[in-house]
Amino acid sequence: MRQNVLFEFGTPIVRVLNALDALSNGRGILVVDDENRENEGDMIFAAENMTVKQMALAIRYGSGIVCLCLTEEKCRQLKLPMMVKNNSNHYKTAFTVTIEASKGITTGVSAKDRLTTIKTSIEDYAKPSDLNRPGHVFPLRAHNGGVLSRSGHTEAAVDLTTLAGLKPFGVICEVTNEDGSMARTTEIIKFSKQYDMPVLTISDVIAYRMSNL
């Protein structure tokens, strides 16, 4: 059903290629997961080239929970422990403790401050002391193996930024409707046309990666 709705965006492989082009050129993308999973759409931006304007868009039209998708290696580098010892989340979403840049911000909640925290985190030689805990940015630890090991938005963000030739870190936020409900595929498509963001599915990313093994 969803594949028929997304046909206007091309085949699964074309949708991925369009997303990679968008990310490499500093645009956001929209990724929807399985209809039998969360059935939600996330805005995804490459952390490396995300702008304050894009962060403001994510905060305004998203859930407000802005997440930074990191590799396991980066989480170790920053010494970010998991938020809880025993993860009972149904989808095993791997939240670490929340973070804030230790310098260059005020309250940490503005679009500019959140982006400063993200840019600080993804610096090649970032240190644990560069971040305060807790904060207003929610890091997520991606599984090694990406979407081939876990079909989540976290892994899709890391896979897509990597495939786009960028640092393997993505910023994600769920898209919501004006009434606060979660946007589904129809609303996601409308949003994509309004903000010029290509749409694809996590299944598309899996298919693309499988075709390149």
Curated annotation (Swiss-Prot):
Phylogenetic classification of the source organism: Bacteria, Pseudomonadati, Pseudomonadota, Gammaproteobacteria, Enterobacterales
Record site: Essential for catalytic activity: H136, E174
Family annotation (Gene3D superfamilies): DHBP synthase
One GO CC annotation: cytosol
Superkingdom assignment: Bacteria
Amino acids binding Mg(2+) 1: E38
Swiss-Prot/TrEMBL catalytic activity: D-ribulose 5-phosphate = (2S)-2-hydroxy-3-oxobutyl phosphate + formate + H(+)
GO BP: riboflavin biosynthetic process
Protein name, UniProt field: 3,4-dihydroxy-2-butanone 4-phosphate synthase
Assembly notes: Homodimer.
NCBIfam families: ribB
Role description: Catalyzes the conversion of D-ribulose 5-phosphate to formate and 3,4-dihydroxy-2-butanone 4-phosphate.
Organism: Blochmanniella floridana
Family matches, as PANTHER family: 3,4-DIHYDROXY-2-BUTANONE 4-PHOSPHATE SYNTHASE, GTP CYCLOHYDROLASE II-RELATED
Cofactor note: Binds 2 divalent metal cations per subunit. Magnesium or manganese.
Gene responsible for this protein: ribB
Statement: the UniProt record of this protein carries the keyword Magnesium: yes
Single GO MF annotation: manganese ion binding
Pathway: Cofactor biosynthesis; riboflavin biosynthesis; 2-hydroxy-3-oxobutyl phosphate from D-ribulose 5-phosphate: step 1/1
InterPro entries: DHBP_synth_RibB-like_a/b_dom, DHBP_synthase_RibB
Co-factor(s): Mg(2+); Mn(2+)
